[in-house]
A protein has these predicted regions:
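Conserved beta-strand-loop-alpha-helix hinge in the C-terminal portion
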Residues: 75-106
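Conserved signature/switch motifs of ABC ATPase nucleotide-binding domains
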Residues: 18
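Hydrophobic anchor residue at the start of the ABC signature
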Residues: 12
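Catalytic Walker B motif of ABC-type/P-loop ATPase nucleotide-binding domains
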Residues: 23-27
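Conserved ABC ATPase signature
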Residues: 1-2, 6
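Conserved catalytic segment of ABC-fold P-loop ATPases
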Residues: 65-72
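Conserved H-loop
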Residues: 50-57
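Helical segment within the ABC ATPase nucleotide-binding domain
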Residues: 37-49
Length: 115
């Protein structure tokens, strides 16, 4: 029986091995320890850099580190709000990027406003 983290790794490996032009990833790093999460984010961003990826995550820093565009889906019925962050450098962004903490703070405030 595989642990949650091992199941995540197997699922992620399958996605990375398939040659699909569009990839949907729903919380792909959620059951991983911090170091493995960071390493797999790096690997995933590099291996999928020429594909369209829709990443669903509840982690604002992960979204900002890996995304080209950020959108929030909320409400019932659901509405999508596109955020205008200037994500100029390519993912995966390094954690000491001076803009990441500022953007993370702004994104967290926006998420709180939506509750």
């Amino acid at each position: 029986q595989l642990s949650g983290g091992m199941q995540q790794r197997v699922a992620l490996a399958r996605v990375l091995l398939e040659d699909r032009p569009i990839v949907l990833m729903d919380e792909p790093f959620s059951a991983l320890d911090t170091i493995t999460r960071y390493q797999l984010q790096e690997l995933t961003a590099n291996l999928l850099k020429n594909r369209t990826v829709l990443l669903v995550t509840h982690d604002p820093l992960e979204a900002l580190r890996l995304g080209h565009h950020i959108a929030i889906m909320s409400g019932n019925p659901a509405k999508i709000e596109y955020l205008n962050y200037k994500l100029s450098d390519l993912p995966p962004r390094v954690l000491d990027n001076p803009h990441l903490l500022k953007w993370q703070s702004q994104l967290l405030h926006r998420l709180q406003e939506l509750q």
